[in-house]
Amino acid sequence: MPLWLLCLLAACSSHQYEIIRGDESTSSVPMLVRLHDVAFPLLVAAADWCSVDQEPTYGFLLKDEETLPIQGGEGVGKRVSVAYVHPRLPAASAGLMLGDQLISVNERTVTGIRAEEVSLLVRRMTVARIQPLQLEVGHRGGRQILNLWAVAACQFSVQLLESNQINGIADGRHVGVTTGAMRFVRSDDELAWMLAHEIAHNVLSHSQDAQLRAMLNAFLGATMGASSETSVPFQRRSLETRADYVGAYIMARAGYDIQAIKQFWRRMESLRSGENTPEMDVTHPTTADRLAAFEITLKEIQEKRDPGESLQPVLESTQ
């Protein structure tokens, strides 16, 4: 069974991408694991700014699988097992391990229940503030009871998108990067930057803003003529600049090296040299403008970090 569902998402640009199915028989699993390893701390770091789209998390994912009986089990059948555990979040701290089989959740037996249903059960208990989450798991031929305490995180689904393009997406509910981007980045810090930028778009409600602006521009275009459309590229560049600013803070709060932002954009500029990218050129800030803005943002972050101040962006000036 797949770990992540197959569907289609609209990207920040006009492109659409197919989301990669991750099951243990495909070569995409290492990419998916790396993607979630990098993304989870960013979602936690941004939690203060997505109060509407916030939910507690433990840092693990589940899957369905056919299993042999564990000690005290009933025989061969279907069980829910742990498909992923983030090394820095509560599930790992409690001792949950990849491949552990779930027996019960807060003393409710989950044998024979699908992973999707178990995940919903965990979410309901967490939203109801039933803490800690108590998991009974089959582990190495025996049983073990683990207590997990949740941490707050943004409720954005993280997706890996099939495309050779170097791109990311944010639609208000999801964030994702392409397989081309995964191959392009040279470090987890560079990948963190791509994800932090997309998370910032969601935190700042840019997809909703873009929809409202599109409706307004369509109305103005119908009543005043096509000249109203000339403001669209400027508006989109402004959204990108704001996402750069807040994204740098998200990245810093998650503990990633924000100097990687400059390295990323310099390599992107080198890659784009000589290429015809009219949509990107019109709707995104130039690399020179981005690097100049980053220098100001990085200085601002460091001035707060040195005396131990909280890394809070000036949201009023970025919305």
Range-by-range predicted roles:
Residues P2-A11:
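Bacterial N-terminal signal peptides
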Residues C12-Q319:
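A Zn2+-metalloprotease active-site environment signal
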Residues M1-P2, Q319:
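Short, low-complexity, intrinsically disordered N-terminal peptides in bacterial proteins
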